């Protein structure tokens, strides 16, 4: 028998939908239910590799972990990975099907709904409850036609909806009441309740506000959720959550990450963010690399050539040269590794017009962007120090050259990855997720002279998910949400 389902939509982006689903997934799992997280459509350049070689959004990876379920591409059947202001790579059930501009993607949506529904019903066949996360705002009625992410999906499956508002931004009453006002009557009829997230202060002071929202909308009040400070200990998927400057570092080694416009997979630096022994900073374009930085990291990119141009336009290429002269280290990961080489060639036009561009020339390697995309979990050891690692590959392109003969990493199957130059001052590789490995992270920080905290990152994430579940059990009517969930049915047709 198919699982019951309930959907969580928001009054806007970044109101806490992803963490709400993760926390409820853990809470219901601890109650003994088999939970499946599901997001019909996600837009993110932070992705995770599934066991079958596909990819899903990082938020769904965290939600799967919260539910203690293996990741599957069906948890996020449509993933959009922005490559420009108007276009994205389109991933369907874990596989890239091409690139599309926003206008062209709108025309694709009716065809994509079939994949969305197939994935949803697969999950529902093997769970007690499916927790569905919407995308962006439920009130974007200009996008309602052909919608597969919010009310379009809810209507197709007749899934009840809970709307989440964020009081920390201010105006939460207007946001929730306004959402009800702009929804079409048949969409509004699917909304069963609301939650107010990120409250600070005495909840009694907002009791009248909760009552006012309920009275004006007719929706059930399901909880006023205090701010959960430990949320920072969980991976953040959206660039909205990307931190800026860190606090003054004192004597701590300073590690800077160049946050170019299309940065991807930046969640892999979350373990470093939790280490008190370093001062981690994400530098926005226009911010120079500090003179006292110990390491400058060039992270992954969804549009390597465009971000390399942006790097040069902001003057970071000059800063990197000065940084190296001062004895600082440079690490490139994935797209950042490609930038460190002498040349990046794109003969088939994966990132725009076919052609090639000069790299930074800090590693004697060249990259050719190819059709094949590497998507796999890997393990092995640092080539020089033989420190074990685990991580994942997620890239297009092949990189080779004289410097690659001194690889940064050696895989357990004998393959190698990356390159090292200037006795380790400059290094690059394709593998993401290295800093989640406690042993490798401690080794890397030790070489910087940082005092390590003994952080057990994976255990910390597990404990934080348990804490989030307990937080929601205290402040949310979880049993009420369970009671609202119902088994999916096709939308009734008019006689």
From Swiss-Prot:
- A Pfam family hit: CbiA
Keyword Transport included in the entry's annotation: no
Which keywords annotate this record? Cobalamin biosynthesis, Glutamine amidotransferase
Q: Name one GO biological process term.
A: cobalamin biosynthetic process
Q: Which SUPFAM superfamilies match?
A: Class I glutamine amidotransferase-like (SSF52317), P-loop containing nucleoside triphosphate hydrolases (SSF52540)
Cystines in this chain: none
Q: In which pathway does it act?
A: Cofactor biosynthesis; adenosylcobalamin biosynthesis
Q: Which residues form the GATase cobBQ-type domain?
A: 252-440
Which superkingdom? Answer: Bacteria
Q: Which positions are catalytic residues?
A: 334, 432
One Gene Ontology MF term? catalytic activity
> What CDD domains does its record include?
GATase1_CobQ (cd01750)
Matching InterPro entries: Class_I_gatase-like (IPR029062), CobQ/CobB/MinD/ParA_Nub-bd_dom (IPR002586), CobQ_GATase1 (IPR033949), CobQ_synth (IPR004459), GATase_3 (IPR011698), P-loop_NTPase (IPR027417)
Keyword Methyltransferase, does the record have it?
A: no
Q: Which family does it belong to?
A: Belongs to the CobB/CobQ family. CobQ subfamily.
Summarizing the function annotation, the protein's role is:
Catalyzes amidations at positions B, D, E, and G on adenosylcobyrinic A,C-diamide. NH(2) groups are provided by glutamine, and one molecule of ATP is hydrogenolyzed for each amidation.
Q: Which NCBIfam families match?
A: cobQ, PRK00784.1
Name this polypeptide is given: Cobyric acid synthase
Q: Which gene encodes it?
A: cobQ
